[in-house]
Amino acid sequence: MSDAKELKQVLTGPIVNNNPIALQILGVCSALAVTSKLETALVMALALTAVTAFSNLFISLIRNHIPSSVRIIVQMTIIASLVIVVDQLLQAYAYQISKQLSVFVGLIITNCIVMGRAEAYAMKTPPMMSFMDGIGNGLGYGVILLAVGFVRELFGNGSLFGVQILHKISEGGWYQPNGMLLLPPSAFFLIGILIWIIRTYKPEQVEAKG
């Protein structure tokens, strides 16, 4: 029973209580770049979740056989291999989205969330817990990406997943899109607003002064 409870905590904790973007402020760069559309935000979230979960799993499986002096190299080799697999799958089955994501899938290799969970958690924890931790942190990352992508695409282009929701004035409708929301800096402000909302709702996440 305690194992099931711990698994649930590991899986759900990063979504709100210890969100990698909102609380740990990790993985922000990719969040700025890929959230102008919900479609790209969703695919990026799934890609990072898969890489984080399986890199955690594989690193945890061999953690007792990795010399401390080369552990970072081993971790990056495993992560890079998984990123290549994910990138090739996207190019094979979702080529247009792969083109839109451009270099950002490849940059998952250096994402602080992936590296951080591998070093801080997978190196010290059994495989199943590490795998669930990877999924949980991927979901936490994805929740923020989808929230930001929802606002940016809806109010920046009047659409969701490419389907027109708010009909533009230029097409005979009533809505004038806010083009500023499609620029990467807008995501920075939206993430800041999300962090403010979360920390207002959960004041224990506010850092102590001094």
Swiss-Prot record:
Please give the InterPro entries that the UniProt record associates with this protein.
NqrD (IPR011292), NqrDE/RnfAE (IPR003667)
| EC main group | translocase
- The UniProt record lists the EC number as 7.2.1.1
The entry's localization annotation reads: Cell inner membrane
Which GO terms label this protein's molecular function in UniProt?
A: oxidoreductase activity, acting on NAD(P)H, quinone or similar compound as acceptor
Task: Kindly list the biological process annotations in GO that this record carries.
Answer: sodium ion transport
Per the record's keyword annotation, is Cell inner membrane included, yes or no? Answer: yes
The UniProt function text for this chain reads: NQR complex catalyzes the reduction of ubiquinone-1 to ubiquinol by two successive reactions, coupled with the transport of Na(+) ions from the cytoplasm to the periplasm. NqrA to NqrE are probably involved in the second step, the conversion of ubisemiquinone to ubiquinol.
Q: How does it assemble?
A: Composed of six subunits; NqrA, NqrB, NqrC, NqrD, NqrE and NqrF.
What this protein is called in its record is Na(+)-translocating NADH-quinone reductase subunit D
Q: What species is this protein from?
A: Shewanella sp. (strain W3-18-1)
Which classification does the entry list for the species? Answer: Bacteria, Pseudomonadati, Pseudomonadota, Gammaproteobacteria, Alteromonadales
